[in-house]
Amino acid sequence: MDIERINDHTMKFFITYIDIEDRGFNREEIWYDRERSEELFWEMMDEARDHDDFFIDGPLWIQVQAVDKGIEVLVTKAELSKDGQKLELPIGVDKIIDIPLDEGIESLFQQELVEEVEEQAGTNFNEDGTFGFLIKFNDFEDVISLSHRLIFEDIKDELYSFEDRYYVYVEFDEVLHDEEEIDRILSIVLEYGEESTLTIHRVSEYGKQIVKEHALETIRNNFPAKT
């Protein structure tokens, strides 16, 4: 397994499928068996602690991506705000995004996140300085309503369908969007949908891409707002 320290808050792991099998796991169970995937994860974190003194002292954000020969895992330390109402997540040099912990986005962070590590597969942190959110919608009408509520500028957005649900993937550039703007946009988006527990990689691979780019604009131009 390869371990790379990105910064004080983030570690990157790459583990091959051969290494995974040598540890007594198989490919299927690390994706579909929560207990076994957590067991593998904590093995990896133990090695990170021994390798580079990467200690766990609070909640984590975890991104898992499947590649040809194995999986890549990005682990970022986060902290609760002093009032316990927000999760403070480093997204760059001297930049922190505040995610409110309230009933409106309880699917994004469950209450136990305050006390223990919780995997959030729907959020993706990329090496190019962008990070994305995968939002699930139970009804296409909710996507239409959102498209007439928000107009995106310099934000990548795509629309997918998967297992009778709709998914909008939105991607922000930390250079173009400050944390206050991102907080505002996410709070509106999550009035209509909920943070997905799936990764964008799984939805894009096994689902159907409906709109490749400018998804909300395309929907807004083709579907009238409900009155």
Curated annotation (Swiss-Prot):
Organism classification: Bacteria, Bacillati, Bacillota, Bacilli, Bacillales
InterPro entries in the cross-refs: MecA_C_sf (IPR038471), Neg-reg_MecA (IPR008681)
A Pfam short name: MecA
One of the record's GO molecular function terms: protein-macromolecule adaptor activity
Descriptive protein name: Adapter protein MecA 1
UniProt keyword list: Competence, Sporulation
Entry's Gene Ontology BP terms: establishment of competence for transformation; negative regulation of establishment of competence for transformation; negative regulation of sporulation resulting in formation of a cellular spore; sporulation resulting in formation of a cellular spore
Reported function: Enables the recognition and targeting of unfolded and aggregated proteins to the ClpC protease or to other proteins involved in proteolysis. Acts negatively in the development of competence by binding ComK and recruiting it to the ClpCP protease. When overexpressed, inhibits sporulation. Also involved in Spx degradation by ClpC.
Family: Belongs to the MecA family.
Complexes and interactors: Homodimer.
Record note on domains: The N-terminal domain has binding sites for ComK and probably for unfolded/aggregated proteins; the C-terminal domain interacts with ClpC.
Organism: Bacillus anthracis
